[in-house]
Amino acid sequence: MNLRLKRARELAGYAVQLTKDEGLPTMLKRGAGFVKRRCFGKKARYLPAKKVLEAQRAEMAGKTAADCGLPTISVLTPLYNTPEKYLREFLDSFVNQTAPNGQLCLADASDAQHGDVQRIVEEYQAKNQRIVYKKIENKGIAANTNAAAQLAAGEYLALADHDDILAPHAMYTMGKAVLQLRQRGEPDGFLYSDEALFSKSIRRPIAAHFKPDYAPDYLLCCNYICHLAVFKKALWDAVGGERPECDGSQDHDLFLRLLERTGGAAHVPQVLYYWRVHAGSTSGGTEAKPYVAAAAKKALADHLARTGRTGTVEDGLFPSTYRVKWDIVGDPKVSILIPNKDHIDDLEKCLHSLWAKTSWDNFEVIVIENNSTDPETFAYYQKAQQCYDGLRVVTYPKKGFNFSGINNFGRKYATGDYLLLLNNDVEVRNADWLTELLRQCAHPGGAAICGAELFYPDETLQHAGVITGLGGYAGHSHKYKKAGGSGYMFRAATVQDLSAVTGACLLVKTSVWDEMGGLDEAFAVAFNDVDFCLRVREAGYRIVWTPYAQLTHYESKSRGGDEKDPVKARRFASEQQRLYDVHGKANILDDPYYNPNLTRDREDFSESDDLRSLKEGRVSVRWR
């Protein structure tokens, strides 16, 4: 009864925090989903079907690590006073793997009062020669992990905590993923999977962490990779293993150093690791282990120093998150392009906020007049150009509305190092908004494009990046979420690598704009920003979004969609088809910075109703 009461209190605390972060509707929706899964849903929803696991075991029957055809993966696990229940569950999860290509390397630093740890391990060793063990002096988590690595015989290493659980198909799936990469001639130095949180049983998981493909800017904000990471032992040896001075964030530090050498990673969208939530675990938050933040900031600062980039590492918006305030190189000029047709009240609000609130002063504004009919509009233009130093109004010569054509025309008058596409119904919220956009681009190795955090007037999110494939074409990350929330895996509160951002506020290097030939004028109204971003990414550039540049977008939530007007509906369908034709429908529906196990029907990062790929144990991997 006490355990049930404790669990109820934990859930109540989670519900209160979720309500504070994301609002009552989100909490109720998630709560309903939890009750549905708990009471009516299938158990073990992230595990492959029983027949799939049986087929894997049949494939590997009678084989050893030497002849199973899969690379050997040595799992490094430091032990320290591990409770018997947790230890046995962890050891069972290794012993019951569907493939024999794993080796378990245990370095035991338990004190004299916990001799049962050694006894239990020796009991398992007697039945399984793939478990190796060494009693060591306790020198901290990093040094103890390094001691475990000295026992490793595998081509690959993986890290696992002593109180967690490996999914039964973890070694099989990672081994097969390596073979897939090799068959395609792609790098195979670093792989990572999705994971889930659990408390009592992995058959009743709390939630999953469905991760994006390799996202280097996101990784600088939090260790989203976490478990299960698998990497070549040769790389581990090259970087010298884990660093004791980063104890608490030793894995984050290790991943940064490994990825400096690989230049990328492969993501396997299968839940291969179960992270136990209990008092004192890092899965319960850094409040349980406050030294984690200091170690993480050191790891990040050292990473910047090694890679020759300069900036200041600070705490992020939430515990376990961080931010790099990149040093801006030089004094880049920004040309702000604002298309406008009448609506001078909106335009004046926008312009006033630019000059009244923007701390970055090296900018010019080019208003692109597009077929206005109200005489007051033209009178306002004259007044505004006298009032705002650096404002110029130019007239688009063609009839009709073509967002791409209008901005391409405005580019001809721009003199900045960067272009900023900005809607006329946007208002600045924080003084450093333009500085923060530039921070992400105007430094060595910076992104080519950066998008901003846009809010509706009612303080809900309008834009935290674009996810392609939502609704069949594209949608906005965390749309309608309450302002100030962390979002899914902190993705509404940390710098994000993305496939696209909205053209309502989009900063791009002028040189990249010119290289791409600007916006494609075949996309007159819809998807011009998405198409442009995809072309930029396909050319090898990065696109990011920052929560530190905030503006209000007065676009109406209730504005009718194009499908309500037959002419607009046909135009929308045509532009959607062109998006498919240019970039491939399969690519549009498979955003690498999303996850195939998340829904395509909503913009809230909720789980897909169809987790077929998990139930089938489908082995897919993508290097990025």
What is each residue range found by the language model?
Residues N2, K6, E10-C68, K289-D331, ...:
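C-terminal, non-catalytic tails of nucleotide-sugar-dependent glycosyltransferases
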Residues K36-A288, D302:
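Nucleotide-sugar donor-binding/catalytic module of glycosyltransferases
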Residues D92-N101, H352-N362:
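Short, acidic, metal-binding catalytic loop of nucleotide-sugar glycosyltransferases
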Residues I136-A152, Y396-A414:
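Glycine-rich, basic loop-to-helix element that forms the pyrophosphate-binding segment
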Residues G154-I165, G416-R429:
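Short beta-strand-to-loop acidic/aromatic patch adjacent to the donor-nucleotide binding site
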Residues H169-P205, V426-Y473:
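Conserved donor NDP-sugar-binding/catalytic core segment of glycosyltransferases
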Residues L235, E245-V271, L300, W433-L437, ...:
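A short, conserved alpha-helix in the catalytic core of glycosyltransferases
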Residues P269-T286, G316-Y322, F455, E521, ...:
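Active-site donor/metal-binding and catalytic loop motifs
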